[in-house]
Amino acid sequence: MGSITHNKGNQIKKKLDSFIGISNWESLSIEHDNINHQLDITLLAIIKDITNKPDYSSCTTTTTTTTITTNNNNNNNNNNVNKNEDNSNTTNNNLIKSINKEVENSSVNNNGFISMNQQKQNYHYNIPTSLKDIKSIIIKSQKLKGQLQSLKQVFKQNIIINNQEVIEQQVDAIKQQQQQQQEQQQEQEQEQQQQQDGESISLSSSTSSGITISSLSNIEYNPSIAFKLGKEFVIGNLFIDQIILFLEFLYGIALEIETNLQYWESIEPTIYYLQKSPLFWLKYYHQQLNRRIQFSNKFSELHNLKQPKPILYISNLLNKVNSFILNKQPSSQQVEQQQQQQQERDEQQQQQQQQQQQQQQHNNSHHHHHHRNENEKKKKSKRIKHPKIELLDKIQKLKSYQVVISVIIGRLTFLLDSLKINTNNNNNNNNTADNNNNNLNDNESIKRFSELMSKSSIIIFDSLLLFNELFKKNKESNDNDKKVDDDDELIKLSKDLINEIINIRNEDGDQQQQQQQQQQQQQQQQQQQQQQQQQQQQSLQLLNFKILLNNQNLINKLMEVMVKRLSGNLSIPNVFIRNWVKLSVGSVIVFFGIKYSYDNFDSFKQSAFDIRDAFIRFYHEHLEEPLLNIWNVIRYDKKSLQLADPASLQSSIDSLGRMVIDYNIDRNHLDINSTETRQHLFQLASRGDISSIMKSYESNIRSPLQNILFGDMIRLILIQIQKEKVDVDKAMVAIDKLLQANELNFQLLAAIPSAIFLALLIWQIKKLFTNQKKTLPYSQLVIFQTLRKINRTLILNNTQDQQNNNLPNFISPLLLTQINILNYSTIINNQDNNNNINNINNNNNNNNNQLIKTQFKPFEKYGTILISTNKLRSHQRFVRENTESQWFNQDVHDLESEALSNQDKIQTINRMFQTYSFLKNIK
C-alpha cells in the first residue's frame, strides 16, 4: 500500500494522542464510579495493544509512546466481558436503543451484498491462490471486528465528570508549584548564607521537582477521566485502522482486477472458444435449437403454416431430450426442499423460545430463503451466452469495478487528508490558548474530532453503498425481468443512521444555546449543564461506535463478496482450463508413446542406453577433459599438445651431416684427417646447407640413367630426401612450440561450446520452475507501462475542463445525497469554514450531474493515479542502486501528491524517463 496513506494515518493518530494527553493508562486498573471493573480491564488491554504496536509506515523514523495500529490485535480476554447495561432512562439512550434494534434487524435485498445479520457469521472462506496477498488483510479486518464487538459494553457505560473540578485541580497544582519554587529559592539563599554542601541542594531540587511532576499529572491518576478519554482514544484509533485496512484491501483488489482485465483484453476470441469444454457447446447449441424450434412453432401458429418434416423430427427429438432432463430435476429439487423444510422447522422451534427480535430475524431469514429459491430457479433457466458476448461482459464488469474502486480510493485518501488538516487546525488553535485552559481546548478538540469521525463514517458508508449499487446493476443486466426497488432496506438504514445524527446534533445545538443563556447563573446549574453536555457527547460517542461497528460488518461482507466474485467467472482460468486441448492431445500422444515403447521394449531399451552413452561420452570428451587440461596448464604448466619429438629431429640432423661428410670423403673432396673441415660441413648440413654435394648432383643429372645405374645419382637423391625430412621435422617442432604457447586458448575453445550448451539447458530448466513476474525485466516492463498509463491519464484529463478535474474543496456523499432527508445539509454541514467534510449543496436532487462532475470524476483520476503509484512501489525493490531508489521514491511521492497540478506530474514522469537507467534499456 502507498506510504502516503500510512503517513496520513500516523499523523492523525499522533494529533489525537496530543489531544488526549495521557501516556500512562494504569489508573484504569483501579475500580471507580461503581461500574463493572471488567470493562476497565478490557479497555486497558485494548489500549495496551494499540500503544505497543509500531507505526504503519516503515519509512518513518520517528517513534513516540503512542505509535498506533490495531490491525493484528487478538484479545482473548474480551470474550469474558460481563453484560452490564446502564439504567439511565434519558431520551438519548432510548433513541440509541431504538436505532440499535433497527440496525441489527435491517437487511438488504439479495441483489446487493450488504446484510446486517452478519455479526453471527464467521467469515472463514476459501481464498484462491491469486488473492493470497490480501489474506492477511482479511484476517486483520476480522480481528478488528472482534475488537469492536468486545467494546460494546464499554461504550454503553456512561460516566459524568465535572470538568470544573479538573481545572481547579490543575490551577491548584500550578499554585503549589509556584509556592514550592519560592520556598526552594528561600532555602537556596539560606544554604548559600550558611555555606552548606552542594549535595543537599541537589537533593532538595530533586524532591521539589518530583512533587511538581506528581501535582501536574493528576489527570493520569484519575480513573474516571482515563476511562472517558480512553474510549475516545480507542474509537479514534480503530476508526483510522478501519480506513487503512479498507484502503489496503481496495489496493490489493485493484491490482488483481488490473491483471485479470489485461488477460481478458489480450486474449483472442478463438482461443477463448477453445477453452470452452465440449459439454458447454452441447448445452449452448441445444439452447439455440430450442429457441429456433420455439420460434418456428409460434410463427407457424400465427400464420397457420405447416412445418416441414425435418423441423418436426428435430422438435420431437428435442422434446424427448427436454422431458428426459426435466424428469431428473424434481428428485433433486425434492431433496433440497425437504432439507430446507427440516431447517425451517428447527429454526421455528428455536425461535419460539426467543424474543420478538429473534422472530423478526427469522422472518428476514425466511425472506432470504425465498429469494434464494427464486434465484436458483432463475439460474437453472438462465440463458447461456455466446463466449464472445460473455467475454465482453467480463471486460465490462471488470472495468466498472475498476472505476468504482478508483473513486473510493481517491475519496478515502482525500478524507484522510481532510481529517489531517482539521486536526492540525485544532492543534494550532490549542497552541494559541493559555496554559490554564488547555484542558477545555483539548475537550473541544476531541469533540470536534468525534464530529468529524461521525461525518467521515457516513462517507465510508456511502462508499459501501456504491459497491452495493454496482452489484445490483450487474445482476439487473443478467436478470432483465427482475426489478429493484429504490427504497430498499439499506437506504432505510442509512436514513435511520443519518436521522439519529441529526437528532443528536439538534439536541447538541439546543444544549449549547441553553449553556450560553445560563452562563450567569449559579455553579450548580453550570455543573448540571456540563453533565447534560457530557451525556450528549457520550451518546454521540456511542453512535459513532455503532456506525463504526456497522461499517466494519459491511466491510467484512464486502471482502467476502469481492473475493468470491474475483475468484469465480472473472478470474483468470487455471492451467488445466486454459490448456485442456493441449493436455488432452499430449496425453493421447503420451499414451501411444508408452504403448509403442512397451511393444518395442528391447529396441527402446537399447536406444536409451545409446543415448546415455552418448551423453556420457559428450561429458567426458567435451567437458571433463578440457577442464582438466585447463587446470593442468594453469596450475602445473603441463603441456599436452605435441606433434614431433625433438630427439628424433636431432638424430635426423646428425644423420644428414654424416651423409654429407661421407660423400665428400668418398669422392676425395675432403681430407680425411682434417677435423676442422668435417666440423664445418657438419654445421652447414645441420643448418640445411648441402651445397658441397650440389655440384656432384648437377653433374650426375646430366646423364641420369647412366648415373642411376653406375654413378652416385641415387645416393645424392637419398641425401636430399634426408634433408627434406629434417626440414619437415623442424617445421613440426616449430608448430609444437606454437601450440604449447597457445594451449590455454585451444583448451578454452574446446570447452566453451559445451559449457554454453549446458548453461542454456540449465537456464531453460530453471526458467520452467521460476516465476517470471518476480524478475527484473518484468518489473522494468511493468514500471514502464505504469508510468505510460499515468502520463496518458494526466494528459487526457488535462485536455478537458480543468475545473472538473481538480479535486474539490470538500467531499460529500454520492448516493446518500439522493435521499430526501429534512435539514440534512444544514445540520450535517460544519458551521466552521475550516471543515471540508460533508459540505453538501442544498439542492441535492437537482444537482446530480454537477455532483458527478465534482465528486466522481476528479476522484476517479486521483484514485487511478494512487493505484498506479502503489503498483510502482511494489516493483521498487528491483531498483538496485541506492541513489536511484531514493530518487524513484521521491518521484513516486510527487505523483501521489494532490498539491501538484497535472502539468507538474507530467514533467515529473518525463524526468523519470530521462533519469533512470532501467527505463532507458527497455525495448
Swiss-Prot record:
Biased composition (Basic residues): 364-385
Domain of life (superkingdom): Eukaryota
Transmembrane spans: 745-765, 808-828
Keywords: Membrane, Mitochondrion, Transmembrane, Transmembrane helix
Biased composition (Low complexity): 349-363
Stretches for region Disordered: 69-93, 182-208, 335-385
Compartments where found: Mitochondrion membrane
Function recorded in the entry: Involved in the mitochondrial expression of subunits 6 and 8 of the F0-F1 ATP synthase.
Entry similarity comment: Belongs to the NCA2 family.
Disulfide-linked positions: none
Membrane topology: Multi-pass membrane protein
Pfam families: NCA2
Designated gene of the protein: nca2
GO cellular component: mitochondrial outer membrane
Protein name: Nuclear control of ATPase protein 2
UniProt KW Translocase keyword: no
UniProt-listed PANTHER family: NUCLEAR CONTROL OF ATPASE PROTEIN 2
InterPro entries the UniProt entry points to: NCA2
